[in-house]
Design a protein with these regions (language model features):
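Extreme N-terminal basic, low-complexity initiation segments
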Residues: 1-7
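Core catalytic alpha/beta fold that binds nucleotide/phospho-ligands
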Residues: 9, 14-18, 22-184
Length: 184
């Protein structure tokens, strides 16, 4: 399936290790991305695929009517364009797993507002910021967030308030620059 948006999409695989990170609540990953594979990716139960999308590259609009309405309601043209690109990329990526056309996916929202594909055991989550998007795919519920490095004020207080005693000790032992990077 040749498509210009595929030039803006890369994929990385993450296989959950036996040792949970941060008590199994979160995993902070440094991933190496590769060009979008041509073949349909297979995803195991203990595996997550992370897709990275450049939202400023050309794309085709695959949005549903409700997604189109949401996009048109956005006041900022750049945010609107990034939303359209992220949702279109999501639909294109879903097609690699389901063999459906991008516009044929029946996406709804669960009881807590999380998007889901009706009639599928495939789970996904989307986040975007600063012209980039990450899309997480798994056979179990998955969440993903994209954060860019920024200055953090009152770092020591945040570490003390939100991390376990052991995690706080490990973070506090780092130099300020390393501590901020590890925190984020």
């Amino acid at each position: 399936m040749a498509h210009p948006l595929l030039d803006a999409i890369e994929m990385a695989r993450f296989v959950r290790s036996c040792k949970p990170m941060l008590k199994g609540l979160m995993a902070f990953l440094s991933l190496t991305f590769a060009p979008c594979p041509d073949e349909a990716p297979q995803i195991g139960v203990a595996e997550a695929h992370i897709w990275q999308v450049d939202l400023d590259k050309p794309h085709k609009n695959y949005l549903s009517a409700s997604e189109q309405e949401r996009a048109h309601a956005m006041r900022h043209p750049e945010k609107q364009a990034h939303y359209v690109a992220a949702r279109s990329a999501l639909r294109l990526i879903l097609s690699k797993y389901t063999q459906l056309a991008p516009q044929d996916h029946d996406i709804s929202f669960g009881p807590y507002g999380k998007p889901q594909i009706n009639g599928s055991d495939l789970h996904f989550n989307v986040t975007h910021a600063q012209g980039k998007a990450l899309i997480g795919m798994a056979r179990v519920p998955v969440g993903i967030d994209l954060e860019f490095p920024r200055a953090v004020t009152q770092l020591d207080r945040l570490i003390a308030d939100y991390f376990s005693a052991e995690e706080a000790r490990e973070l506090m032992a780092l130099h300020d620059e390393e501590k901020a990077k590890a925190f984020l």
